[in-house]
Amino acid sequence: KIKDLGYTPGLQPEADYYAVKMPVFSFEKIRDADISLGPEMKSTGECLGIAKTFDEALYKAFLGAGIKLPKFSNMIMTVRDEDKDEAVEIGKRFEKIGYKIFATKGTAEALTEAGVKAIAVNKIEQSTPNLMDLILGHKIDLVIDTPPQGAEHSKDGFVIRRSAIETGV
């Protein structure tokens, strides 16, 4: 009988540790590839962080995946119009944990109108300083980019995402 082997019905007893499994993507190794995530994306591996607390296990998983944790707590947001309401909620959360938010004009206006502090920066094709100066100057820890449809806008989004990966953002 299974019971004779020491197994009991029900859930496994709670462990005294946390385990966090994290996917690993090889974006930086695939030059000139668009790194936007979609449902068809597959990771090239995974790593595991194990510790006595969830925060420490998550930290170890980030380190194992090669993800650098923020140095400056600066972020760029540039989102399409239909994503602005959701961007406001995300902006509020990041502002609450101490992030300084740089955003393109339309996104900055949406954030500011909702009470989120945002510093407007120029788009790629506009004069410097622009958002690429911040990324290439290694002043940014996080980029949230949801580019609108269309060839020119898609090109901008590609450049933003690719530059972020290549500079370790």
Label every PLM stretch briefly:
Residues 1-169:
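ATP-dependent carboxylate/acyl-activation modules
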